[in-house]
Structure formats: C-alpha cells, structure tokens
Amino acid sequence: MQNVHFRRALAMGLDRGAYLAQQVGDDLKYASMRNSYTPGNFVTLEEEVTVDINGTEKTYPAGTYYGQIVQDQIDADGVKITVWDPTANEGAGSSDGYDGWYNADNSWEEMSQAVEELAADGLTIDADNPIQMDVVYASSSEVFTNRANSLKQSIEASTPVS
C-alpha cells in the first residue's frame, strides 16, 4: 500500500456508482457522491490570487471556485481524476454528483506501473503470486454482500493483476 500507483489503481478501479447503487439504486447512485474531501464550491476567491502550481505561477480572478484551483493542481501533477467539473450542476460547477475517479483504463495503467516498480523492489506479482485483498462485510446483509461483490468485480475488471 506504500506504492502511490497501487493506491491510485485501486481508487480509479472502483466503480463507486455501481457500488452505491447496491444500496440506493441506479437512480440515486450519484446523489451522495463527492470527488474531494471538501466541496469544490465551498469557497470562492474574494480577490485575484496568484498560486504556484508545480513551479508555474497561475493567476485566478476573484470568484474562482476552490475546486478549480484543486483540479488545476491535480492536472499539473498528472493524476487522471476529476474532482471539479465546471459544467456540472447545470453549469455552476461541482465536485459532486458524478464519479470523477473511476476509469478502468487509468486504473490499468497505474497498476501496471505499480507492478513494475514493486518488481524492481524484489516483489513478484503474477498469476502465481497474485494480490489478495480481504474485505470485511456483514454477509448476513444482502446489500453488503452485493456491495462487496460490486467492489470485487470492478477492481478485478480494471486492473491487470487480480
């Protein structure tokens, strides 16, 4: 779990919409989904501000949402997730109501890189030495069982090593 690409692969490989749908149904699966700890529209800049993003100065005008600044930093870091969508919420912008993390292709890339880096450290991950994760859940609950199965299926489908 210390490998950043391994952690990203798991985060990008989990179809949170399918996972939540097991409890609230397809119609509401995105209703409670947030893509960052703090909502992107939590605060706006009161005045023009210049921010250093990986060595590049970027000026944001007054009224810029916090989420836009966070998204710009994430993009500059090369992390392929969306925590702020300026077109969401009928054009008002939001970090909520969509799954900005799930992307099986990106998960596959991240896990491939993780496996390569871990191999360089002497750790073999292959069909004979697979990654195994234990998920604790109340098997007496159909909802929890379905959620665990959803988690398992989405991770296995989106990572090259299952």
Language model segments and positions:
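Append "and occasionally in soluble cytosolic enzymes with long acidic Gly/Pro-rich linkers
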Residues: Q2-S158
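A generic structural motif
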Residues: P160-S162
